[in-house]
Curated annotation (Swiss-Prot):
Catalytic activity of the protein: 5,6-dimethylbenzimidazole + nicotinate beta-D-ribonucleotide = alpha-ribazole 5'-phosphate + nicotinate + H(+)
One Pfam family per UniProt: DBI_PRT
Source organism of this protein record: Clostridioides difficile (strain 630) (Peptoclostridium difficile)
Keyword terms of this UniProt record: Cobalamin biosynthesis, Glycosyltransferase, Transferase
HAMAP family found in the cross-reference section: CobT
Molecular-function annotations in GO: nicotinate-nucleotide-dimethylbenzimidazole phosphoribosyltransferase activity
Pathway: Nucleoside biosynthesis; alpha-ribazole biosynthesis; alpha-ribazole from 5,6-dimethylbenzimidazole: step 1/2
The protein's Enzyme Commission number: 2.4.2.21
Membrane-crossing residue ranges in chain numbering: none
Protein name (Swiss-Prot/TrEMBL): Nicotinate-nucleotide--dimethylbenzimidazole phosphoribosyltransferase
Amino acid sequence: MSLLESISKNIYSLDNSSIEKTKQRLDRLIHPTGSLGKIEDICMQLAGIFGNENFDTSKKVIIAFAGDHGVYEEGVAPDPQNITKLQFPNFSKGLCGVGVISKFVGADVVAVDVGINCDEKLDGVLDYKIRKGTSNMAKGPAMSKQEAIRCLEIGIEIAEQCIEKDYKVIGIGEMGIANTTPSTAIISVISGCDPLEVTGIGAGLKKERLKHKAEVIRKAIEINNPNPTDGVDILSKVGGFEIGSMAGVILGCSANRIPVVIDGFISYAAALIAYKINPKTREYMIASHLSAESGTKRALDILKLDPLLNMDMRLGEGSGAALAFDIIEASNYTYKNMATFDEIDMGR
């Protein structure tokens, strides 16, 4: 049995007993029942994930993956492809968006190269390179089935390494010029909607180029004909190495009963791949923010996820997931430290 098969078979639903115990305490807190809103939802979900109403969320990490994309040659992104190579080392150095925010919220960042188009090893970056970028999905499959499984299993492996280091909350992030194109293709395939409905500007594509980007995605879907019910098939035909690796983190976290915080648009696509491999993974996901990218609503509707934040962000990197860490920690602190009606005489 492969690692992917083994992990997928070990994903179970949340612990309802712990959820109920947490709800009972929440209902006794000195506040109108339910008035803490999503704070209460977070606490109940975390209890169900950990199988314990006395859960710990103090040690947090963003796992970020980077890869380049053959479809870049179709003119779907405005920036030079070598930006991936130049920017990604800044993740672990704490110099970019996710690095700075993670530092502020007390989270670590693990940066992993799974497919950057370069030969050199990058400073502060783990080297798990599958190859130097995917193939052009507008001309054929982005990767082989074996490569798709490999990037999923890399994600599982990195997640389990972090869990062994006692990280209790894991967020996902990414870097890859042109990676909104495969992400949009994944969302289009799974939602069944036309690519133009879910195609956005990514990292700053001019609006007059949107139609071209959608046409490239449509062509890729027509040529490759991915099976909308098969996560591995979709990933191999129109995905990306960093997208598959993020999906692997979701699978690894779910099998090990660890909450996984989803970032923005690219990670929605990864979440959909994980969901197609095992629908129970959705129960372990916390959506950090509502991405400003087109296609967001389609993806979140399928996953039935309600983001914690709406910040008009479309940076990616894991920046939104890092921001959400503080909300998760504050929710846990509130749950554990607020007084109950049993403890204080409120005249009830």
